[in-house]
Amino acid sequence: MPTTMIPLEHYRSDNTTAAYSLRWSWAGWPSTGAFPSLDSNSWGTLHSLWEKDGIRVLERRCTDSQWQLTVSSRTNVVPSFIVARLKGRIDHAFRNSKSGFQFSRKVSLRSLGSNTEVEVQNYIANQVQKAGFCDPKFASQLSSFTRKWEPSDCSEAIVVTSGRYWFQLHLVLVIDHRHSIRDLQFLGRLFEEVQSIALDRRYRLSAVSVMPDHLHIRLRGVVEESPEAIALAFMNEICRGMKINPIWRPSYYVGTVGAYNMNAVRE
C-alpha cells in the first residue's frame, strides 16, 4: 500500500456521494397546560418549511400533553438543528396564532432504524463468519479486527441544555474498486486508527469490523456534527493518520440506529 500524506480533505461533500437512511423521533411537551391545535393549512406550511431545512415529516402523533414527530433528514443536517427547527417553527406558528403557548425546555430526539441496535450490533459482529473465508487461519486472524463493546453506552442519552439526544449511526465504508486487502498488519493498523479517531472526536464506539474490502462502524455521534461530517471525518482521518493514499470508494452508507425500529414507532 503506497504511503504518502494526503490533502486534509480529500473526501468532501462535493465529491463524495451517500446512500443513507436517517430517521428520528422528536418529542416536545408544553411548559404548562395543553398544546393548542393547528389547522391543516398551518401543518402544510410547516411541512413545506421543514422540507427546505432538509427535514421531512413522515408521521405525527399529537395529544394535549405531548407532540411526537417522526422525521427523516438529509446527511448534512445536524441533530441539534433538527431539534431547533422543529421546535422553533412550531413556536413561530403558535406566536402567529397569539395562543400564548410556551414549550417546555424538555425535548428529545431519538435516532431510529429499520433494524434495532441489537440487530445491527450482531450483524457487524458476524461479518467474518458470514463472509465464509476459505482460509480458516486468515479468518481467525481477521476476526481480531472485529470488536463489540459490551455493555455499550452508545444507547445512553446525550444530555444538553436543549434536551436529550439518542444519536446512533451505522457507517459503512468500501475500499475503492472493491479491492481486497489481505495484509493483516495493514488491517490491524486501520482497526487501531478507527478507535483513535473516535477517541479524538468524542464518538463512542459500539462495534467495529474491519474486512478486507470494507469497514463497518456503529457509534454514538456528537450532536453538533451531521452524519455526513462524521462519515467524511473517518474517510479522511483514517488515510491521514495511516499516511496512505486515499483508499475509499468516494461514497458511503450511513443509517440511524436505535433501541426501537420504525415498527415500534407505528404501534
List each model region and its residues.
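Charge-rich, low-complexity N-terminal segments
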Residues: 2-267
